[in-house]
């Protein structure tokens, strides 16, 4: 049977940058094309809204997962069952300058298949086999509550509240009542705070290194201009920034990126080891680069800019610390400034010429020179980095280096420019569920919880990044794992984690709360079935939303399936058994809490309609009154009146705080913390001697068919976007690998068997796996699901103690 292609598609004139806007029905090609279109520019020309049947209800819901977008869903319900799903096709229009529609991507539109998935958890269960075997027996809710409450009280009495840990989970990140991260904003945290607190964590698997690195540059979380501001840009440079797959919906960045470029006609340059869907013919240039070498490229660019007088000296003198000797702190060593480092006048004596950078990055020297001149002479320029470059062993320094391009050229704090960080956005002060204060001030890196189980009392502030005290007193004895797959699937070095969790004398109780039998759920001692977003009422807040912020009324669409309960019901019942019910609930049901929070939100946002009006309306939108969000605008306009939160109040190219840390912390060989944004290869780089045994760099990427591991069990998405290992034809030919061949990817940490995708869209010497595929081991622990974390390392990055998920050396062979 042949698929008939609509005449509108056949008649469309397809050009390189016009590909997307001339594709009226992008979804038709979605399953068969190598490049899935993340949005459709004229999709509103086709009326997708079918007339509702007389017995049909249309109820607003939302996709609340951790992609960087939040999208409304309109559920068509007949006799208590979801029949099909639409998105925002009746509020606003496709007008970029107005309150545009927020259309869900292929993931959100498949929500019905998540709700009715055969993997759904149906009732409470307790483990009867070894952890990881997935052997459980059904128990009642009362028994589950009693087991949890009794054992938690025992562990607190024996080890203290510091032994209770809330694991990282972002499965319901967009919710208000149901929010699953950060841990301090969850209902589990509220429960624990009523019971004496818990061991907290800092950082996150998405952005640990950039959050820490740019904190020492700008102070706090590094802000960025909204992508809508690209309408004022002349040039867009994206380092490892791939919104076309990560934030691809109408609520995300891709829409703004392309709409704004239609106004400004800005050139777009993508720097990435992999040719991503953000390009897909819309980019003007793709520059492939070796993973982990972004800082070396920036240093080569800076050399050209400095020697050819393309830097904004006035900006550097007024707003920055440490560019040259004029602004170098007195505490710094002679020639300890950035300019000296780049020109080879610093301690290493090496000039960071384009030729030097080319040897490291794989980018030709003449291309580096050309790019430096273009960036240095084109203003305003939107220079941005995604969170791929920072997810490396040298990620903190790399983020500081990339931001230097925006700093050197004076593009910070102006329309059309950016800080060098990822894009920012306008946000509304909507009130979320209060979770009280944690009496325990101790925290660890979110990435080092397995170490805290294995060697907790040995972990110190100077060696392991423990915060709040000099060292941990006790190991982790209980884990709450709510709406997250980081217990196994999303945490690095799965085989090591498996060994640690298998011993239930170490961590004595693991409680998993989830909707599906995930890889992590199989390691639970007590497994509680959660409601999906479609089975309860909540508010969903936007995330990467450009210059139009919004809130979605996520109504209850159907009754909870099987014996599933909401997280509020579960924690309220546990609070009753733990003797803190009144403190926890304050006498309110979930809906009463929502009405209470909404009333508070209306005080902060007077334009909000009444609760009942909002329930019918489904989504509330508001444009940024300033037009576009411009990061550090106030600082740029008056740095004296609006200083940054760095120690100097300025942009710190040289950081004395980092110099102090470098002098006092205990670091393993190869780890580097430096006051300047230098290049350091880090461990398992392409320069590592280990590459003789494992000659290929393995990097990950966020795949369009999943949000991390969420939606990873939806059949149609798996069929449309197969899990494959991407490999360049040159590397494949050396190994006798053809497209579609089964290959083994392996290193000392594990082995994965998966099909190969042979494509020139990969940098030679580099292979890639989409992260989030569900771990599926055989009896020899060889993974058949394509889970990259079988191969990643639990060695943390130096400063943030974050996950270096893209720093891996492997070998690949045909099976």
What is each of the regions a protein language model found here?
Residues 567-617, 709-711, 715-726, 730-815:
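Long, contiguous, secondary-structure-rich segments that constitute the structural scaffold
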């Amino acid at each position: 049977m042949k698929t008939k292609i609509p005449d509108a598609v056949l008649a469309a004139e397809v050009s390189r940058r016009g590909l997307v806007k001339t594709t009226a029905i992008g979804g038709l090609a979605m399953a068969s094309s190598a490049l899935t279109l993340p949005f459709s520019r004229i999709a509103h020309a086709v009326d997708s809204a079918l007339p509702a049947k007389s017995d049909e209800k249309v109820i607003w819901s939302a996709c609340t997962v951790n992609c960087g977008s939040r999208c409304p869903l309109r559920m068509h319900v007949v006799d208590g069952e979801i029949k099909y799903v639409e998105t925002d096709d009746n509020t606003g229009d496709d007008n970029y300058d107005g309150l545009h529609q927020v259309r869900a991507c292929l993931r959100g539109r498949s929500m019905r298949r998540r709700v009715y998935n055969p993997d759904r958890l149906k009732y409470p269960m307790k483990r009867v086999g070894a952890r990881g075997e997935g052997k459980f027996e059904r128990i009642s809710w009362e028994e589950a509550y009693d087991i949890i409450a009794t054992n938690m009280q025992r562990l607190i009495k024996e080890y203290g509240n510091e032994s209770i840990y809330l694991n990282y989970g972002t499965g319901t990140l967009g919710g208000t009542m149901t929010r699953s991260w950060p841990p301090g904003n969850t209902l589990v945290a509220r429960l624990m705070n009523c019971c004496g607190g818990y061991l907290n964590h800092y950082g996150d698997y998405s952005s640990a290194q950039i959050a820490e690195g740019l904190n020492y540059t700008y102070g706090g979380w590094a802000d960025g201009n909204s992508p809508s501001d690209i309408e004022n840009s002349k040039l867009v440079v994206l380092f490892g920034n791939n919104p076309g797959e990560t934030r691809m919906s109408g609520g995300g960045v891709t829409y703004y990126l392309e709409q704004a470029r239609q106004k400004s006609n800005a050139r777009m340059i993508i720097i990435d080891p992999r040719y991503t869907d953000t390009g897909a013919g819309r980019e003007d240039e793709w520059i492939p680069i070796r993973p982990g070498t972004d800082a070396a490229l920036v240093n080569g660019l800076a050399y050209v800019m400095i020697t050819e007088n393309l830097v904004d000296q006035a900006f550097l003198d007024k707003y920055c610390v440490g560019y040259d000797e004029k602004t170098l702190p007195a505490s710094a060593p002679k020639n300890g400034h950035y300019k000296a480092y780049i020109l080879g006048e610093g301690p290493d004596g090496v000039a960071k010429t384009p030729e030097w950078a080319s040897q490291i990055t794989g980018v030709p020297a003449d291309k580096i020179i050309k790019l430096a001149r273009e960036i240095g002479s084109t203003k305003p320029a939107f220079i941005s980095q995604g969170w791929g470059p920072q997810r490396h062993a040298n990620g903190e320094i790399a983020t500081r280096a990339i931001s230097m391009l925006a700093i050197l050229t004076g593009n910070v704090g102006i329309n059309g420019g950016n800080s060098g960080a990822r894009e920012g956005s306008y946000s509304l002060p909507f009130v979320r569920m209060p979770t009280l204060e944690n009496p325990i001030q101790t925290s660890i890196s979110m990435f080092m919880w397995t170490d805290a189980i294995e060697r907790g009392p040995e972990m110190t502030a100077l060696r392991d990044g423990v915060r709040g005290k000099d060292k941990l007193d006790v190991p982790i004895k209980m884990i709450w794992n709510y709406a997250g797959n980081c217990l196994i699937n999303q945490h690095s070095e799965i085989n090591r984690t498996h060994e640690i969790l298998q011993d239930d004398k170490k961590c004595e109780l693991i409680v998993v709360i989830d909707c599906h039998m995930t890889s992590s759920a199989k390691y639970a001692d007590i497994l509680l079935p959660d409601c999906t977003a479609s089975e309860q009422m909540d508010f969903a807040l936007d995330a990467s939303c450009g210059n139009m912020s919004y809130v979605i009324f996520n109504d209850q669409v159907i009754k909870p399936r099987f014996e599933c309960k909401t997280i509020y019901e579960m924690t309220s019942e546990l609070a009753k058994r733990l003797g803190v019910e009144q403190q926890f609930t304050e006498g309110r049901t979930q809906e009463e809490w929502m009405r209470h929070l909404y009333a508070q939100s209306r005080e902060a946002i007077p334009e909000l309609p009444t609760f009942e009006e909002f329930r019918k309306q489904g989504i509330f939108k508001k444009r940024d009154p300033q037009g576009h969000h411009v990061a550090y605008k106030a600082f740029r306009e008056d740095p004296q009146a609006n200083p940054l939160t760095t120690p100097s109040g300025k942009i710190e190219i040289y950081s004395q705080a980092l110099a102090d840390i470098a002098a006092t912390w205990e670091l393993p060989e190869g780890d580097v913390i430096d006051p300047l944004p230098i290049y350091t290869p880090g461990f398992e780089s392409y320069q590592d001697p280990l590459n003789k045994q494992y000659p290929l760099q393995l990097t990950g990427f966020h795949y369009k068919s999943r949000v991390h591991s969420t939606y990873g069990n939806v059949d149609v998405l798996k069929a449309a976007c197969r899990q494959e290992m991407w490999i360049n034809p040159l590397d494949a030919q050396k190994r006798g690998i053809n497209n579609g061949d089964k290959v083994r990817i392996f290193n000392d940490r594990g082995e994965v068997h998966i099909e190969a995708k042979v494509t020139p869209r990969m940098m030679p010497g580099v292979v890639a796996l989409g992260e989030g595929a569900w771990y599926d081991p055989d009896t020899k622990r060889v993974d058949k699901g394509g889970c990259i974390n079988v191969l990643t390392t639990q060695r943390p990055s130096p400063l943030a103690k974050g996950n270096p998920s893209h720093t891996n050396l492997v070998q690949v062979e045909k099976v």
